[in-house]
Every structure is written in structure tokens, then in C-alpha cells.
Amino acid sequence: MLTNPSQVIIRNQDSLSQHKVLVLNHEADLLPKALLDVAASVDALALDYHHYLHLAPHANTKLRCYFGHDLPHQDPLEREKYDTVIVYFPKAKPLAPYLFNLAANHLVPNGQLLVVGENKGGIKSLVKLLPEYFATGMKLDNARHCLLFGSSLEGSAPAMKLSDWVSQYQLTTPQGEISICNLVGVFSEKRLDLGTELLLSHLPTLSGRVLDFGCGAGVIAAALLKAQPSLSLECVDINAMALASCELTLAANGMTAKVYPSDGLAQTTGKFNGIISNPPFHDGLASTTSIAQNFVTDSAKQLQHNGIWQIVANRHLPYSDIIAAEFGQLKVVADNNKYKLYYFQHK
């Protein structure tokens, strides 16, 4: 089943006949595979690891699938070129200019840019957002509650440098001052959010192998290693920009950890002495609650004897029931008017 934006692309796929196509920020469907009905070849870059895992089993000689903030093994001066680049307009609007710059670096001169997105997702401002090296965006289709815009590469775009897309700032935590590197599209308030502050204010003493689930830009990871530098820390997230941010944050603080993508805990292995998280489960949507349920169930299985599990969660959502059902006895170590901090030790 194709998502609504993908269905709009299929409605307009004739313009891709025999093209070498690059799809950026694709969704959890098989649109890149479907485009092979008309395109000569398709490369697809997912910024969400779940989306990558959905498509990757279908890779073949004409369909290459990648995950990350950029295509791998690219010479900055000799990037691979495509006749058409399709961009799915990102949910995090600040990520859009990054994707347009990446698209421009991979287009042949006068190559075709297609941008698709849901009406409610910010794409209506596309014409204002397109950099000057692209022709004025033209509306090509309006269907399935989505818009499709087309443009072409008219000028030369700045070379892609990750450092151009990072904001770095100092953050005061209960563990001391840390440097945070935040790439576009990664959540940041440039101060400790209430949930993370609650967690860091009651950070347990840990040892051995510890997992930071949903690491984001690495705030918890850096604070944890500042206080307890001997930990063997692993940081996982589903978002490519978050993982790259976390790596930059750790490097800026002279710290090391294993940073890698994981869909839930599926890509982690073995058991942990500690699992710490401010998980991205705060919106109360059914799909998010399901992810939370899986995280709690899986993390219970991956906790060592005497291991410590501590997460902060929105007090108004039913995660306390999910957690209690899995762990039985657990403590609410602290709370504020928005969050509760849950603690469990595997005896």
C-alpha cells in the first residue's frame, strides 16, 4: 500500500521515463520499487531506519537502498548525478533546505526536482523555501490531500558540508556543562526540556553496558558520560539526523560511545546493565503507544540481573499501566506537573 504522497508521485510518473532517479526521505512503502516500471534505475535514501528496513529487502541491481543523512561514499566534488530527484517534504520543516541542497548536489544541470508532501505538513510554503539555484516551483498536482511541485536545477548549489547544518551550544545539566551539536530537523529547545531535566536530576549510578534509547542529539549520553565516564554506552535512534547529531555531540565533548540505528530494540544485541531513556512517546497516538509497549516489553527482556531501568514519561498518558504490567513492582522516583520518572531494578 502506497502512502498518499507516493500515490501522487505515481500519478505523475510519466516524467520519469528512463530516468536515473534518486528518492530522498522516502516513507514506509515501496514507491521506489514501483518507479522501476518507468525509471531506468532508482536509488533511495531513507532518513528513518524503519522506512529503510521496509524497502531494503526489495533492493536489486536497479534499486539501491540506503539509510543515513547522506548517500555513502560520495566524493564531495564528484557526487553521483541523477536526472530526477524526488524529495518527500519533511515533517520537521527546518530539514527541508538541507534536503534541497542535497538534491541539488546530485542533479544533472537542468535536472528535474519533484517535491511532494501532505497539505497540512508545510509544503504550501515550498515556493518560498526553494533556494535560488532552483527554478521557481510549479504546482503539478493536487490530490490525496497532498501537493506535488516541480522545479529544475538552474544554478550551482553550495557543496554539501554537514558542518553548515549544525548549531552548537553549551547546555548546563546537573552533571555539569556539556556541548550539544544539533543538526537541522532534530528536536532542540537549546535548554534542558522538563523531562530530560527530571531524569538527569535523579540519574542512578550505573556500571557496565548501558543503553540510551532514542538518543536524539546526545544530551543524556553526554551528561551520563560526564558523570560516569567508564560506562560502555550504546546510543540508538531511528532518525539519521539524530544519530549524526549524537556522534558530533560526543566528539565535541571528547567522549566515545557506540552509536547506531535501531527500530525499537530490534538491532540491539545481548543484555544491558542499564537502560536509560527519555523516549519519544509523548503524543498519545495509537501508533506511538504501540511503539512504547514494544519498547517496555523488549527492554524488560534485555535487562541483566541487577540491571537498572529508568525512563521519564508523560504523566498524562497510560505508560504507567504498560510499565507496571511488564515490570510489576516499580518506583516513581520523581515527578513534576508534566512527567513521571520510573525506576526498576531487575532482582
UniProtKB/Swiss-Prot annotation:
Keyword rRNA processing annotated: yes
Domain of life: Bacteria
GO cellular component, one term: cytoplasm
Keyword Lipoprotein: no
Subcellular locations according to the entry: Cytoplasm
Main location: cytoplasm
Gene Ontology molecular functions: 16S rRNA (guanine(1207)-N(2))-methyltransferase activity; nucleic acid binding
Primary role: Specifically methylates the guanine in position 1207 of 16S rRNA in the 30S particle.
Family statement: Belongs to the methyltransferase superfamily. RsmC family.
Subunit structure: Monomer.
Protein name: Ribosomal RNA small subunit methyltransferase C
